[in-house]
Amino acid sequence: MPGVFLNEDDYNFDIALRRFKKQVEKAGILSEMKKRQHYEKPSVMRKKKKAAARKRLMKKIRKMNMA
């Protein structure tokens, strides 16, 4: 779990907030929260996963044709 501790000597809230946001982003907490906000049926999850794989494949094919 991300956390930022401040000393009394170097109390700069902006830097601490920036550091905290970076840690949260790296841990993937916000994306996980958005994903779990509503229940998604397993069939819908499989369908989305399959569509994403197809999209990646098409992108890869397009990239190969351009080069």
Swiss-Prot record:
GO terms for molecular function: structural constituent of ribosome. This is Small ribosomal subunit protein bS21. One of its GO terms (biological process) is translation. Belongs to the bacterial ribosomal protein bS21 family. The keyword Nucleotide-binding does not apply. GO terms for cellular component: ribonucleoprotein complex; ribosome. The gene is rpsU. PANTHER family: MITOCHONDRIAL 28S RIBOSOMAL PROTEIN S21, SMALL RIBOSOMAL SUBUNIT PROTEIN BS21. Keywords: Ribonucleoprotein, Ribosomal protein. Signal peptide: none annotated. It comes from Desulfovibrio desulfuricans (strain ATCC 27774 / DSM 6949 / MB). Pfam families: Ribosomal_S21.
